[in-house]
């Protein structure tokens, strides 16, 4: 509900995405009207490693990324930086972190209006010159230069072939290698429900996305795969999860289907 309010709130909301921006933090940032990233920004949706899925609106913003980059980032959990965030639409501006105090001071000094459009314009007026001053310090991105490869890897007859393409790729590229390994070590079952969720919400509204994510999350957390992922990564930290299936092809179709069946008569977010 908060994320929906953020995305429709009339007043400007500035999110300063400095450092690690993952999980719920990324969902909050995605709904803000003025999203700023810095040279230290690190973004990822690594839910495949704990047998979850990119929620808090991930089904929306991943489906709106260029080419197949959203699907690739979702099933591999690959990490991206500020340049990637701007390219994929997760952020609106890159501003060097040294300008944060200037931004705050100018916001304090601004004469705000009762007109929401005027206030948004004033925020842009403050951020724009600092964006221009920061161009030279923006790090090189990974998604845009790799987009052709990403699109080819994700161009499979089905999700199993896409997974095979990524896991079996032979590459010396460090970023692609880490993405490959993320999927290879992640939950095969999670890779399936992540891909299915993205497919089913391709043409959904933002409200419909949150309703669908709540349903999937409720079903996922009740299944032992999620508990095993949390145990291996966050509790025992042995990074050796005993996944229920070794490959996506071993997962019974009827099992996957269960995660997409509503566990209630009425969705708790039905009145969004």
Task: Give the ranges of each region predicted by the language model.
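Gly/Pro- and small hydrophobic-enriched strand-loop and loop-to-helix capping segments
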Residues: 32-55, 89-104
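Contiguous mid-protein beta-loop-alpha structural module that forms a pocket-lining wall or clamp
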Residues: 57, 64-120
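Hydrophobic/aromatic residues within transmembrane alpha-helices
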Residues: 28-29, 84-85, 194, 233
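Amphipathic alpha-helical blocks and their helix-capping loop/short-beta junctions
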Residues: 96-183
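C-terminal amphipathic alpha-helical interaction region
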Residues: 216-219, 224, 228-272
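Glycine-rich beta-to-alpha active-site loop
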Residues: 7-50, 72-73, 77-78, 82
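Substrate-recognition/cap regions that form aromatic- and gly/pro-loop-enriched pockets
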Residues: 159-170, 175-215, 221, 225-227, ...
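Short, small-residue-biased leader/transition segments that mark boundaries at the very start
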Residues: 2-4
